């Protein structure tokens, strides 16, 4: 679980630690609370300390800063944090259909996230969409995000055209869910 948060983050200069998201969260969402709880429960990897040093204070509602009771109790000693994690530069999460590739774990490098696999259940027709970070910026974003009651949700954001998906001969992915 901890590796997922590290692989989806984009170390960069700025006010928050950006993360990959495909219209289902927000760019500042992070796993700070999850990693601190895992650490406290004994699931400890030094790479987790690196991640915790990258998260900015109060960057998201999931945060657990040290000036709160939970943060004070669950924040590990970060002095042993490595300069960079020992994780590989790429990973594929086959079961969820996500892949991440990066040039380095240093700040402001390049990160490509690709969403692939089936479009089913609660998904959009966005298999094959991608997000690109480069030189500290999100260069290619996923445009498919709006509130469910908004009429544009079904009329536009649910469809391939709202995402970074390649169309073949002008054809997009089927709009119907594969599994209802």
Please report, for each region that a protein language model flagged, where it lies by residue.
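Carbohydrate-active enzyme catalytic cores, enriched for enzymes
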Residues: 1-139
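Active-site rim segments in enzyme catalytic domains, especially the processed small/beta chain
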Residues: 125-180
């Amino acid at each position: 679980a901890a590796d997922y948060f590290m692989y989806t983050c984009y170390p960069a200069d700025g006010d928050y630690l950006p993360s990959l998201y495909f219209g289902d969260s927000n760019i500042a969402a992070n796993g700070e609370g999850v990693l601190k709880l895992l650490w406290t429960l004994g699931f400890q990897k030094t790479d987790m300390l690196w991640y915790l040093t990258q998260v900015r204070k109060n960057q998201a509602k999931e945060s657990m800063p040290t000036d709160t009771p939970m943060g004070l109790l669950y924040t590990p000693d970060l002095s042993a944090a490595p300069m960079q994690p020992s994780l590989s530069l790429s990973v594929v999460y086959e079961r969820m259909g996500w892949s991440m590739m990066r040039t380095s774990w240093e700040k402001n490098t390049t990160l490509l996230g690709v969403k692939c696999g089936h479009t089913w259940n609660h998904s959009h027709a966005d298999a094959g969409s991608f997000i690109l970070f480069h030189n500290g910026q999100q260069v290619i974003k996923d445009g498919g995000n709006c509130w469910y009651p908004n009429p544009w949700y079904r009329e536009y954001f649910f469809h391939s055209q709202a995402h970074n998906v390649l169309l073949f001969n002008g054809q997009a992915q089927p709009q119907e869910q594969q599994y209802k």
